[in-house]
Amino acid sequence: MELTTIAEDLAFPEGPVVMADGSVIVVEIAGPRLTRVHPDGTTSVITEWDNPASAGPNGAAVGPDGHMYVCNNGGFLWSDVNGMRFPLDRASGSNQAPEYVTGSIDRVDLGTGQITTLYTECDGHRLCGPNDLVFDSTGGFWFTDLGKQRVRDLDKGAVYYARPDGSAISRCIDNIDHPNGCGLSPDGATLYVAQTTTGRVWAYDITAPGELASPRGTCIANTLGNLDSMAVEAGGAVVVAALRQGLLVVAPDQT
């Protein structure tokens, strides 16, 4: 496969969102900023977080109101090894910056660049490190919280459901290790979640907005890869980015 470079010199880009005008909006986690990549390869900054040591825009998605909703992981420690940047202090094994306070769900006005923080906690427990999100047909969204890793311990992850106006948030899946990418089946009846460290992809039956038949789910892929974000094709195939292997594709019949 021949790959074409469209834009360079981005500070750890993730969360690409294809826009109607042909541009692609990405987060630059190490920026931390939200950037538009135009079809000709030029870039323009939409907004920057004013607390770079404790902000880390991660997954992003356009909401029903046209605003961009961003998982803010609260910032990382960084290491540069052999020309590559890693969101982790390789010496200590920690990725939690000293300035870290909390993770959050942020809303960005794409016209003005204004950032509004919608959620920093759920039922009195802070969001540790939100990672990826996906909207459903009712206008609500599911999001993963991968958490933070410290020298001697790490957070247990979770999956949440929230409303885009900041009015309601609920914890739907608890104690899941490193939940990363998430997506919905074309009919909106199934939630998919990829785990980074286990290399597994899980499927959960949705019974109503923000409600699952069971928080246990069904494992539809068990790999040796370290999984990242995902996308679900119109035909139902689940495509997951694997950090070293490339792309993992789970067919609609889950083979």
Residue ranges of model-derived segments:
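Sequence-structural signature of mature extracellular/luminal beta-sheet repeat domains
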Residues: 1-255
